[in-house]
């Protein structure tokens, strides 16, 4: 994979969603980290590959990635690989080419099933297909084109489980029950508890505290 192709893999969604105000662009570094063996521990027990699809005029019309995580695959009833980072123009033909490409690669490596859209490694980002509620997504939640559902279902993908995400306006009046406020007041009076605002100069310490929690 050349530097130019890696860059195009990241840049294509930015063009695809440029007129969609609800789309939140992932950090380039986060996407690259998924495919970097030095930053993704999943490579110690698996492998990943990614492709871009171009049209007759040479412009990118889609992208996809495929993964094999041996630990996750062994936990399934049959050898199962993963498909993710799927993005495509509104073209069923292009979508099926991407699906076929991932399927063939996985099949050649002994996989009998394909799960997607998923991520290679941690399952807190880039997991799932949004099928309802096309509003601005919460952190780490999937967002995609509405027509993706038709392509996945037409290809033969079936719903494995459903996941819901919700938004809550923390600035709204009575957003928390009164008992929560009483509990917070009670805890705040106990010795050993302090409240501090985030300080950029001590970002490492605050990050370490968050990780420990």
For every predicted segment, state its role:
Residues 50-52, 59-69:
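Conserved beta-strand in the GNAT
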Residues 36-52, 56:
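A short helix-loop-beta-strand connector motif used in the catalytic cores of GNAT acetyltransferases and
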Residues 54-56, 69, 86, 119, ...:
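Structured loops at beta-to-helix junctions and adjacent beta-edge loops in soluble globular domains
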Residues 142-213:
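Acyltransferase donor/substrate-recognition loop-hinge adjacent to the catalytic core
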Residues 60, 70-73, 122-124, 173-174, ...:
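Flexible loop/turn segments at secondary-structure boundaries
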Residues 73-161:
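Acyl-donor binding region in acyl/amide transferases
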């Amino acid at each position: 994979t050349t530097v130019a192709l890696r860059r195009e893999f990241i840049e294509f969604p930015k063009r695809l969603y440029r007129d969609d105000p609800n789309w939140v662009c992932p950090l380039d570094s986060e996407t690259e980290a998924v495919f970097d063996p030095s930053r993704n521990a999943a490579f110690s027990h698996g492998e990943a590959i990614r492709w871009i699809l171009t049209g007759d005029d040479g412009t990118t019309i889609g992208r996809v990635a495929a993964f094999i995580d041996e630990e996750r695959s062994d936990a399934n009833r049959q050898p199962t690989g993963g498909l993710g980072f799927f993005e495509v123009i509104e073209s069923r033909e292009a979508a099926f080419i991407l699906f076929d490409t991932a399927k063939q690669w996985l099949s050649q490596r002994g996989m009998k099933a394909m799960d997607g859209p998923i991520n290679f490694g941690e399952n807190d980002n880039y997991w799932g297909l949004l099928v309802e509620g096309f509003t601005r997504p919460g952190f780490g939640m999937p967002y995609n084109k509405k027509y993706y559902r038709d392509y996945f279902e037409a290809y033969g993908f079936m719903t494995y489980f459903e996941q819901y995400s919700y938004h809550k306006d923390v600035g709204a009046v009575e957003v928390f029950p009164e008992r929560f406020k009483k509990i917070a007041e009670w805890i705040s009076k106990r010795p050993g508890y302090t409240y501090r605002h985030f300080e950029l100069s001590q970002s490492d310490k605050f990050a370490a505290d968050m990780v420990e929690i």
